[in-house]
Structures are given as structure tokens and as C-alpha cells.
Amino acid sequence: ELLQFLFDGGCELKNYLCASELGYVMQRELEPYGRRYEEALAMDFMEARTVTEPSAPEVETAGKGDLDEIFACAQRFVADCGLLDKPEKEPFRKVLDSFRILRADGKIVSMARIAPATQDDLRLVLVYTRDEYRGRGYARKVVNSAKNEILAAGKRVTLNVDRKKPVSYHLYLSLGFERMFSQGEFRRVDNRPGS
């Protein structure tokens, strides 16, 4: 009844983010209305509450001179993940000190941002390592150091991990993260004739 009311009122449901189980139910319920959706991003919400290894001293807080490089890495992250959001540079300037970075060969090779979440949690977002530096332990050092910093502040650490990226998933599990629930971003599939 709610869906009929919304659609009769001219509302549209472009995309939705929810627990995967609910998303699949919504897929079935929306089909009779001629609206098809598919799960474009399949993620697990994870949480960590304990220190599992010491922080890496070479992980540092980003500074003003890192803006261009962080923004370039963020753009690659968004493209790699298939996200629809297109980052804009200026907002990054305001949150530079929330990025933890690791340098090698004179450039940032791995990064993560500590972002607000709830009163009890902080989230790790924009966890990214340049392609040519993957598999060398850089992401582990950045994620672990940021995680330890959050825990030292008396907060829980949360993040989302793409279920299609087993290397990242294994990294987070090895650092003490536990899966709490699955969620997905469901995107509308245009099924009109000629599309």
C-alpha cells in the first residue's frame, strides 16, 4: 500500500541502501510496478573494539600540502568502487586532518579517513592504496593505526567492505573487525523500450 501511495503521488525511488535481506524483498515488491532494481554494491558493515597490533609510527596525519594527492586518490577510490558520488575538492580541504596517510617513494601510497558516525563510533572511510603499492602491507598499517587511534579515544571503529573484494575483507578480519550485517545499494535498472 505504501508503494502504491508513493507512486500515485508522483514519487520515484531512484536507488536505495538497506540491509540486503530487505533490499531483496523490496526488489520483488517493486517489480509489479514496472520498476526493476539490482544490487550494485554488496557490502558488509564491520566493527572493531580491540587493539590487535601496535600502530605503525610511519603513518601520519595529512597536512595542507596533501590536498591534491588525497583528492586524486579519492577520485580513484570512487571509480574503483563504482560509486555514483563524484567528489569535489573543496570539502576535502576542511577535513584534511581526519586523513591518515603513509608515504613511500615521495608520495602518498595509502590512506584512510576517520569520519564521524555516532556518539559511540567513528568510521573508517576512503580506505585506499595505489594499485602499484598493493600487497605490501601499507593498507594494513594505515587501517590498524587509524583503528588504534579511534579505540584510544574510547570509540568503536566501523567500516563498510565490498563483499566482492576478498583481500580487503581478509585484511579487516585479521585486524579484529567483525561482520555485523550485510547491506546493499540497489540501483534502478531502466527497463523502458529502447533503453
Model-predicted regions and their roles:
Residues 1-56, 186:
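Acyl-donor-binding surface of acyltransferase catalytic domains
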Residues 1-5, 129, 135-152, 169-174:
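Conserved acetyl-CoA-binding loop-helix of GNAT-fold acetyltransferases
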Residues 17, 82-90:
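A short, aromatic/hydrophobic, helix- or strand-capping loop or linear motif
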Residues 17-23, 158-169, 185-194:
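Conserved beta-strand-loop-alpha-helix junction that forms the acyl-donor binding cleft
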Residues 21-38, 140, 163-181:
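Conserved active-site alpha-helix within GNAT-family acetyltransferase domains
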Residues 49-84, 195:
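Short amphipathic alpha-helix that is part of the acyltransferase structural core
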Residues 87-105, 109-128:
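A conserved beta-strand-loop-helix scaffold within acyl/acetyltransferase catalytic domains
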Residues 101-104, 115-117, 136-149, 160-162, ...:
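Recognition helices and adjacent regulatory flanks at domain boundaries
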